[in-house]
């Protein structure tokens, strides 16, 4: 069984971001921006994540191997947006993203966060199924008319974190 945990992001993780942000197959499922990203741009974006102290950013670890990134960002009206990327493709389809999301939800609940949402590309069916397994519900399609790379997303919400943090669950 593969064990999953989250750890705080650190400077050495920039190499993972550089790799994942340049992977066209991965980008088609996430941002949709397929243009090449320079080392300077990677560094700029990564430093913004690394230095951000108000949001939660973690690396997803599976059996001591870094396989992805997950975040929780405060938005309006006590809502928090989550995003996850399992960047290492050999770990796709194994339920590890779902495990990471459940761990993040537990951390959120411990910190009093009860309203979480995400936006996902409608074509990313594997991700949508994972989010539904974690308790997210489809709410609406969101049009992004000014974003040529991501014209539409599907908003999914988890209004009340219902996972019992005291219950031992096999993760």
Where are these regions (language model features)?
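A short, well-structured alpha-helix characteristic of acyl/acetyltransferase catalytic modules
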Residues: 1-35, 43, 161-171
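Short alpha-helical
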Residues: 12, 37, 77, 125-126
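Amphipathic alpha-helical recognition patches that constitute DNA-binding helices
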Residues: 16, 81, 99, 115, ...
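Hydrophobic packing within well-folded, soluble alpha/beta domains
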Residues: 17, 104, 113-116, 131, ...
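Acetyl-CoA-dependent GNAT
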Residues: 35-91, 101, 107, 160-163
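Active-site acidic-Proline motif in GNAT/NAT acetyltransferases
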Residues: 88-90, 94, 122-123
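Conserved acetyl-CoA-binding loop-helix of GNAT-fold acetyltransferases
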Residues: 93-107, 129-133
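C-terminal "cap" of GNAT-fold acetyltransferases
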Residues: 114-117, 121-128, 137, 141-171
């Amino acid at each position: 069984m593969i064990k999953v945990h989250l750890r705080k992001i650190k400077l050495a993780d920039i190499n993972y971001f550089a790799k994942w942000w340049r992977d066209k197959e991965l980008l088609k499922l996430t941002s949709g921006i397929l243009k090449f990203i320079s080392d300077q741009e990677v560094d700029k974006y990564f430093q913004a994540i690394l230095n951000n102290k108000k949001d939660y950013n973690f690396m997803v670890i599976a059996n001591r191997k870094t396989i992805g990134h997950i975040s929780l960002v405060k938005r309006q009206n006590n809502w928090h947006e989550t995003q996850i990327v399992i960047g290492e493709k050999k770990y796709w389809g194994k339920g590890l993203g779902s495990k990471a999301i459940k761990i993040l939800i537990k951390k959120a609940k411990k910190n009093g966060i009860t309203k979480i949402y995400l936006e996902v590309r409608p074509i990313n069916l594997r991700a949508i199924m994972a989010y539904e397994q974690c308790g997210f519900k489809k709410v609406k399609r969101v049009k992004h008319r000014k974003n040529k790379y991501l014209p539409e997303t599907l908003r999914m919400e988890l209004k009340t974190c219902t996972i019992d943090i005291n219950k031992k669950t096999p993760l």
